[in-house]
């Protein structure tokens, strides 16, 4: 019979009474103490962890988007920002895979604890709203949901004072191509809508990638990001429809119909529309 493997025989440290351990570094005790089901239903734990892990990934999305925006604002080498935007796209790919786990919960499973949720709903996520605001979909009506938490409301209001990631990209586009955009293009308190001059400038880039390589790659990184973001939204819709059908959402929205409306939002419309012009 073979002996049980003992890592200490190869020099692995096995005592952490006076040193920081894995659990200490990650604050695992605090992290694992955050799950508080409001019912005895077995599947409520799945529901909680699905949403909590999504919020953790969103925390990283915000971290990467802020850094990418700062780098683009500073000008110079865009490549570090490209890495961050690629990471954001991959995070949404990861979040897409997570829907497959939640889909193991059937409508019957969900009904065992749905009433325990009260009026809490995913559209109340301030981190998701920050992501939307940072990407340029600045629907200020959604801030009302956070009026009961002044610190969150202030955080969202502060974001509206900053240029979105796409605003920053458009400034770089104008600077490097010599294009000029109307002031409305840079408005920070409204969702961005397609602009003919912006589309023409992006077309200039895509018709000569070698000349405008940084802008060309930036455009494609933004398209990648929105592509994965759209898939995440679509998977959200199909998962909700699969679990609750066309019932109203717990937060009072129209549920699936509300989510389908979100599928129509274009974050970087000119980058999609120009493809038909090439």
Curated annotation (Swiss-Prot):
Reaction(s) catalysed by this chain, per the record, are: L-tryptophan + O2 = N-formyl-L-kynurenine
**Does the entry feature the keyword Metal-binding, yes or no?**
yes
Summary of the function given for this chain in its UniProt record:
Heme-dependent dioxygenase that catalyzes the oxidative cleavage of the L-tryptophan (L-Trp) pyrrole ring and converts L-tryptophan to N-formyl-L-kynurenine. Catalyzes the oxidative cleavage of the indole moiety.
**What InterPro entries does UniProt report for this protein, alphabetically?**
Trp/Indoleamine_2_3_dOase-like, Trp_2_3_dOase
Keyword annotations of the record = Dioxygenase, Heme, Iron, Metal-binding, Oxidoreductase, Plasmid, Tryptophan catabolism
Relay the cofactor remark from the entry.
Binds 1 heme group per subunit.
Swiss-Prot/TrEMBL cofactor(s) = heme
Protein's pathway: Amino-acid degradation; L-tryptophan degradation via kynurenine pathway; L-kynurenine from L-tryptophan: step 1/2
Family designation? Belongs to the tryptophan 2,3-dioxygenase family.
Q: Which HAMAP family match?
A: T23O
Q: Where does substrate bind?
A: 47-51, 110, 114, 250
The lineage's top-level taxon is Bacteria
The enzyme's main class, written as a single word, is oxidoreductase
Give binding positions for heme. Answer: 236
Q: Where is the signal peptide?
A: none
Which PANTHER family does the annotation name?
A: TRYPTOPHAN 2,3-DIOXYGENASE (PTHR10138:SF0)
Q: What is its EC number?
A: 1.13.11.11
Q: What is this protein called?
A: Tryptophan 2,3-dioxygenase
Q: How does it assemble?
A: Homotetramer.
């Amino acid at each position: 019979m073979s002996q049980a493997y003992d890592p200490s025989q190869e020099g692995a440290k096995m005592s952490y009474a006076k040193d920081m351990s894995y659990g200490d570094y990650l604050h695992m005790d605090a992290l694992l103490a955050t799950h508080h089901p409001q019912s005895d239903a077995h599947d409520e734990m799945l529901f909680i962890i699905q949403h909590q892990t999504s919020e953790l990934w969103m925390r990283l999305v915000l971290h990467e988007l802020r850094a990418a925006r700062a780098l683009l604002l500073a000008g110079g080498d865009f490549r570090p920002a490209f890495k961050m935007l690629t990471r954001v796209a991959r995070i949404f790919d990861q979040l897409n895979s997570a829907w497959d786990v939640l889909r193991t919960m059937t409508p019957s499973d969900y009904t065992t604890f749905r009433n325990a949720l009260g009026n809490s709903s995913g559209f109340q996520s301030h981190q998701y709203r920050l992501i939307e605001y940072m990407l340029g979909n600045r629907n200020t009506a959604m801030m009302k949901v956070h009026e009961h938490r002044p610190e969150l409301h202030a955080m969202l209001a502060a974001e509206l004072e900053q240029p979105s990631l796409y605003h920053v990209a458009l400034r770089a586009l104008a600077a490097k191509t010599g294009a000029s955009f109307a002031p409305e293009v840079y408005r920070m308190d409204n969702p961005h809508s397609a602009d003919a001059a912006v589309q023409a400038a992006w077309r200039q880039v895509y018709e000569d990638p070698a000349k405008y390589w940084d802008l060309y790659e930036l455009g494609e990184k933004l398209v990648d990001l929105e592509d994965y973001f759209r898939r995440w939204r679509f998977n959200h819709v199909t998962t909700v429809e699969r679990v609750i059908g066309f019932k109203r959402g717990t937060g009072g929205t129209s549920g699936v119909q509300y989510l389908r409306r979100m599928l129509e939002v274009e974050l970087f419309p000119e980058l999609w529309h120009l493809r038909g012009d090439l």
